[in-house]
A protein has these predicted regions:
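Cleavable N-terminal export/targeting peptides
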Residues: 1-49
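Subset of outer-membrane beta-barrel
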Residues: 37-325
């Protein structure tokens, strides 16, 4: 019996070391993937991979160091290793760029700490666009078609020491348009430091090889890398958190986008959030401001966000509900 227990322990240790190797390999090959894409292509594909998921991050202009919730998979998977919850899941809806793309987006995310230092994440996001009308070469109407984008994946996070964690998320992305179909696999990697109210995250997003279209053209994934830093203060029942982020775009034209956000909470129940994001015009990324509210009570959460802008992000709206225990 003792031998059986020891064998199981060795098997579990082997699994953990394999996951560490997978994360390390992703971090190691990240620069190579970036340079390969930049040398192969100059136009990025699957831009929806950069969409902000979850009403909390939407209301903070995409900043995610504070997010160790159900949507950690999408923003900062390494933060999942710091979660104090046993399980956290959430579902959300977003009306994305209603004056331009008019996309209806449904998001799902989950976080599960499986041990004191390990956590796993999962996420699914589906965007549906307005119906397009098909016609043949003679102008005769055919069946209608609804373009769709989807992303689904899983991630893992490991707390190396009490204040430092690493994580990686692996996603499949697919796009179905009226004249094209694209599929790709992409990885996100994060390294997070958290101590004395300070949060610092280094990240690389959408790492992967070039996407080939049906007409054999190569397109880069919208890869980016950046650094985010935040600090939180508590005074009585109130708390205040602020963060700044710098992000550079590597897939396609090079661009830089700075962001800043703040969150006020009372008794960890009522939340008010705001953020500003300066876009990278070369990459087609607009600038916008964001506002949001949240109510968290008895494990349940309700969060809302709204974006203000002169361009594509004008009146983008997101809402989400979640449960944790």
């Amino acid at each position: 019996m003792k031998g059986l227990v020891k064998n199981r322990e060795f098997m579990n240790m082997g699994k953990f070391f394999n996951i560490r190797k997978l994360i390390a390999a992703t971090l190691l090959f990240a620069p190579a993937l970036a340079s390969a894409q930049e040398s192969a292509v100059s136009t990025s594909a699957l831009p929806f991979l950069d969409r902000t998921h979850g009403a909390v991050r939407s209301s903070m202009s995409g900043l995610g160091t504070v997010s160790d919730d159900a949507y950690s998979h999408w923003g900062n998977v390494s933060a999942a290793a710091f979660s104090s919850k046993t399980f956290h899941a959430g579902v959300g809806y977003s009306l994305w760029q209603p004056s331009v793309t008019k996309a209806s987006v449904t998001d799902f995310g989950a976080l599960w700490p499986i041990s004191e230092r390990w956590a796993v994440t999962a996420g699914v996001s589906v965007a549906a666009y307005p119906i397009e009308h098909r016609m043949d070469e003679y102008g005769v109407a055919l069946s209608d078609f609804r373009p769709m984008d989807a992303v689904a994946g899983a991630g893992v996070a490991f707390r190396i020491i009490d204040c430092l964690s690493v994580g990686a998320a692996f996603n499949w992305a697919g796009s179905r348009g009226i004249d094209s179909e694209l599929d790709a696999f992409a990885a996100d990697v994060n390294l997070t430091f958290r101590k004395y109210g300070v949060n610092v995250t280094a990240f690389a997003k959408n790492l992967g090889t070039a996407v080939k279209s049906s007409d054999r053209q190569n397109f880069a994934l919208p890869m980016s890398a950046g650094l985010e830093a935040g600090y939180g203060l508590n005074f009585g029942k109130s708390s205040l958190y602020g963060a700044v982020q710098g992000q550079c775009w590597l897939g396609g034209p090079f661009g830089i986008s700075p962001s800043a956000a703040a969150e006020y909470s009372w008794n960890n129940m009522i939340f008010c959030r705001a953020g500003l994001h300066y876009g990278a015009k070369k990459n087609g990324l607009p600038s916008y401001g964001s506002l949001g509210l949240g109510i968290h009570l008895y494990g349940f959460s309700l969060d809302l966000s709204w974006n203000a802008a002169l361009g594509a992000m004008k009146n983008t709206f997101a809402c989400g509900v979640g449960y944790s225990f």
